[in-house]
């Protein structure tokens, strides 16, 4: 898988522990509570590997709506410039005329990701670094591309939105140690 890096040797916990970041395990995000956060990325970013992020987002919302009625919040990248926001113009227009229920946009510059995901059911990401932040904070991730660093510890299929397959805690901890 593309999300594997380095020499593939399990690392001890000392580096992780030296950071002082606490991992409390997966949150209990089951049931009817919680929104879905879709993490947009900067259009043309190399980690997208020629994927059109706007088309991916539309396709993702369509696929999710087949399987869930949960609220969906599409989060813009916090580093997008005003000019760069123009790269999402097609996406904004498409959603303005689409009849999707309970889909909103969140400005990633104005809402800190920590606040945005604290009541999330899960984060859906192509290959955004927000996947790592979500896992560290116990929020499940659907990582749809093998280049997503959380691909090996999260769900990988949108159709499983209501029954997420997540890595067991020992695997997640080892993944964190290996980062």
Model-found features: residue ranges?
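Leloir-type glycosyltransferase catalytic cores
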Residues: 1-33, 152-179
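Short loop/turn segments at strand-loop or loop-helix junctions that form parts
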Residues: 33-45, 74-79, 145-146
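Structural motif
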Residues: 35, 71, 121-122
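Class I S-adenosyl-L-methionine-dependent methyltransferase catalytic core
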Residues: 44, 50-51, 86, 162-164
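Short catalytic/ligand-binding loop motif for oxyanion handling, primarily in non-cytosolic enzymes
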Residues: 45-48, 80-85, 132-133, 150-153
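Catalytic donor nucleotide-activated moiety binding site of glycosyltransferases and closely related
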Residues: 61-109
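A donor-sugar binding/catalytic signature common to diverse glycosyltransferases
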Residues: 108-155
